């Protein structure tokens, strides 16, 4: 199932999961799904516009025209559904990431200010400082043994969220909170067969599967919110939520709702970014040409001193690499919606209540949408290249519910990758290429062990 097939264009092909050509029985697919969801897909998903393994199972849709309807034109007819709420409300409570309708609209408006491009660019020095500290630590540790960059990068992106959005998070213990978050994600990543194969309505009144791990995290966050109410404003995400007011009703957020939103942003804001960067680190190690080209770009744009907000837009090739990594390894490999009423999608009649799965991993490698889809080719995203169909490339979703932190995530990823390539040389220390495992996010099986050494010609990157 893990392939490194030769590219017809002679390009490097990194590890991938492509289901077998023969369609297994639906029960075989069911048995494969809990350990790696993509193993439960048919290869048809990579070739066709729509696929359904059995009459009562969810429909998998990859046709861009249908996806535009789902995410944009008819978005209100395709809500997130009961299964989504059951899986993610333990993490995000009643916050913007799981809210619907009017509750979603005003929370989204209140939160979006923190992620405006002008606001995000001001955070660059904090991102750079955290990354410089982390890379220095990785180089030192690697002198004794390989460093697993999967948890290391996750810790880096967690620290960045705390530094940039929570003004340093002095009201909780970072190590303790990160350990609790890791335990939470391990638990939420246990995929149940009912998630894949039972109708959405089945989940409407089922108990939350992960609530017991939520309370300790919320207690830390609520303590911070309570303390911040009596302190001068700092202009961070916490203050924006404290001041938020529904323009229609005048409603403000109580401590519980603020805590739900902060917890959601912490969880969504660092885990997904870290997964993409973990795969990007493998690209630097396995494809030295890419690492060298990024180094040369950084050398040209930033001859001395730290990377700044003004430099980031000039790191064009680095951004192309990030975009291509997110195509090949989208952290959110699967999006879900539910048909609120009977409709037709890509020629298939879909009854009301049917769950619609959007297999982003397959969409990004679809044989109809991409040339040489399994190959690594950052030139797809070059300024002079024709842009991909808006609904064939969904690293951050689409439509009204597109990830509001997309600009922050891209800036963070570009700055971290540029700093890492500038400062360090990576050598993959695993016995075999990492296998993508799709459970909660698209992670590498067995982590990402790396030897991290000082980059060639370090004087060129003096800070």
Predicted regions and their residues:
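Cytochrome P450 heme-thiolate monooxygenase catalytic core
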Residues: 2-14, 79-85, 103-105, 119-275, ...
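Cytochrome P450 fold signature focused on the C-terminal beta-domain
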Residues: 232-238, 295-315, 328-348, 357, ...
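Conserved cytochrome P450 K-helix/beta-meander segment immediately N-terminal to the heme-binding cysteine loop
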Residues: 358-385
